[in-house]
A protein has these predicted regions:
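Juxtamembrane intracellular "pre-TM" segments in multi-pass secondary transporters
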Residues: 1-13, 191-231, 416-418, 424
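Helix-loop boundary and gating motifs at the non-cytosolic
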Residues: 2-57, 218-270
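Residue-level signature of transmembrane alpha-helical entry/exit and packing/kink sites
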Residues: 11, 100-105, 225, 229, ...
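Substrate-agnostic recognition of the 12-TM MFS/MFS-like secondary transporter fold
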Residues: 13-30, 51-67, 71-86, 103-163, ...
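Structural signal for membrane-spanning alpha-helices in multi-pass inner-membrane proteins
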Residues: 34, 87-94, 158, 162-163, ...
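C-terminal transmembrane bundle of multi-pass solute transporters/carriers
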Residues: 51, 58, 69, 73-75, ...
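Transmembrane helix-loop junctions in multipass membrane proteins, especially transporters and channels
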Residues: 95-99, 124, 131, 163, ...
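Hydrophobic alpha-helical transmembrane segments
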Residues: 101-112, 138-196, 261, 268, ...
Length: 430
């Protein structure tokens, strides 16, 4: 399987394994920070997660700008070391009995903002680490499955660890995982793109940042399909949040007459479907990425329809697993398009735009769901969302066919800089 063959490349295997550990560490951090925050400040403690999400949203576009300006290896190393120090301060404060809510709010702010710099730098570095498009596709599948593995492994590890470790040392584990990630990035340094591969333009101040953001938006606008894809990403993120994040817990309680256990099973089934689809998408040769994206959306919608077609837990589990198959069909080809059809010195900005759109839409979806389910039943709400998701896939496919038949499709050609950079990256790996 091509998906597993990627692990034969030491640089990719080392990076992926370190990111799995880092993601598991993040899961432990999330458990500990919410527990301490609520224990110290009651319901006000939920502000911690809101602050972290808000920081990632506010600094998302800015992170993409600097991921394209600076040496990406240096960015990731620095961010991991800073996150290790910041998170590592919490167990020290807890040990001396000095941990307060404002400490955790500051840490959440820093972790969220630093993550918005690390993620685009990582995504923009993958084309350099992969030797060809097929390997890059498989590497994207590996990275996409990372957080899903963390969700699966995290809960199973948390219980036994709490028997032997005080909860505050979950912060310690996360800090150590950041150091492991930094060590891996240091070791694969020669495979990562040096600073001359990043943006050659240098701007100062707010005007420079706005200019770089404008350049990133222009790259999206010039692409024949990315503008429509990004609009659909917003719609899908809103509707997915309404249907799954908000709708499924209500559906399990009101229509399946079940508690948190049933909800956990449905979420688990979704995780299993995601992982299976990731393995498949990382193993096959993707000839038509746009078709895969549109098919993925239809599959997600059909899965949601299946989930609520009858008030039955087995059917809900089957529908959840089926819907999950569509996620990687959408995500992995989109990452491949960004990484191979956008000039290397703009990948960070385009990726951060995608990430910011997704996070904004999910926040909006949560707000809409709070009102929507007061006026319509949960199954009807999920059905409406499913139909909207499917319409983005069907409508997108029809739009692509129309552009191709009418001759309005603009071919995407690598820029001169893109070709030179890819050739240099391959030669540096030999």
């Amino acid at each position: 399987m091509q998906f597993l063959k990627v692990l034969r490349y030491p640089q990719l295997a080392l990076l992926w394994s370190s990111q799995v550990l880092s993601s598991i560490g993040d899961f432990f951090y999330a458990i500990a920070v919410m527990w301490f925050a609520i224990r110290i400040a009651g319901s006000t403690g939920v502000m911690v997660s809101a602050v972290e999400a808000g920081a990632a949203l506010v600094f998302g576009l800015l992170g993409g700008v600097y991921a394209d300006r600076w040496n990406r290896r240096t960015i990731m190393l620095t961010v991991d070391i800073l996150r290790a120090c910041v998170v590592g301060s919490l167990p020290v404060l807890a040990f001396f009995g000095q941990l307060q809510l404002w400490h955790m709010l500051v840490v959440a702010l820093l972790v969220g903002s630093l993550g918005s710099l690390f993620d685009p730098a990582l995504q923009a570095s993958l084309p350099t680490l992969a030797q060809d498009t097929r390997t890059l596709q498989a590497a994207n599948g590996l990275m996409d499955v990372t957080r899903r593995l963390a969700r699966a492994l995290g809960p199973s590890l948390a219980g036994p660890l709490l028997v032997v470790l005080p909860l505050q040392h979950f912060f310690t584990l996360d800090a150590v995982s950041f150091l492991i990630s930094a060590g891996a990035i240091f070791l694969i340094g020669r495979h990562l793109s040096p600073s001359e591969y990043t943006s050659k333009r240098r701007h100062d101040g707010v005007v420079g940042i706005l200019t770089d953001l404008k350049d990133g938006f222009q790259q999206i606008r010039r692409h024949p399909y990315l503008p429509g894809i990004f609009v659909a990403v917003f719609v899908i993120a809103v509707t997915w949040t309404i249907a799954f994040t908000a709708g499924i817990p209500l559906y399990a309680e009101r229509y399946l007459n079940s508690g948190p256990g049933a909800y956990g099973l449905i979420v688990g089934a979704y995780g299993v479907g995601n992982v299976i689809s990731n393995f498949v998408m990382g193993s096959i040769k993707l000839r038509r990425p746009l078709a895969a994206i549109m098919l993925g959306r239809v599959i997600v919608g059909l899965g949601f329809l299946l989930m609520v077609c009858a008030p039955s837990l087995p059917i809900a589990l089957l529908g959840s697993a089926c819907a999950a198959l569509g996620g990687p069909l959408d995500d992995i080809p989109l990452m491949l398009i960004i990484q191979t059809e956008i000039p290397p010195h703009h990948i960070g900005k385009v990726y951060s735009t995608y990430s910011t759109i997704s996070m904004s839409a999910m926040a909006l979806g949560g707000l809409i769901a709070a009102s929507l389910y007061q006026y319509v039943s949960v199954p009807i709400g999920i059905v409406l969302c499913a139909l909207l998701i499917m319409s983005t896939g069907i409508g997108g496919a029809l739009h692509i066919q129309w552009k191709r038949k009418s001759g309005k499709e603009t071919a995407v050609h690598p820029t001169k800089d893109t070709v030179i950079i890819k050739q240099e990256c391959r030669s540096s790996q030999q």
